[in-house]
Amino acid sequence: MKSISEIAAARILRSRCSAQVLRKYLKNKNFSDGEIEPLIESFKGYGYLDDLQYCRDFIVHGERKGWGELRIKRELRKRELSSENIAIAFDEKLENSEADEGNTERNRALAVALKIIRQSGMDIENKIPEKLRNRIIRRLSSYGYSSSIVFSTLSKLDEMAGDEILFDYEI
């Protein structure tokens, strides 16, 4: 029979997880709290479990996928990370993003919207068709962008709609 540390290590190697997820996993394997807590503390000491770093890495992952802040936070809560760690990671991200203006939430939302327009194949003359606007709203909302960002993105697209460079626009 495998030891608790072997089972926990196998779980972490299979896919990264939070301390809370690992705790639940080990409880489901019928280990006691007396066995689980020292193991989790030792894994934290070795750096195998770091919930704050997991939050930081997941924020980067979510941004690469084009997700907004709300979606990233929802996904982190689903992975049972503490609100405190999530807030700290986003605060750090905000401090670091002041130097990196290109990767703002507004720019990511605009990139997602432009991708939808390109994929639609619709002719855009002076205004984006209502059907396409609604598709953009639904996609940005499902990606976790706030309504203010969604509608500012639509305004930006309306400004760009008459331009020939709309399809060539790069963020």
Residue ranges and their predicted role:
Residues 1-171:
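An alpha-helical, amphipathic repeat domain used for nucleic-acid recognition
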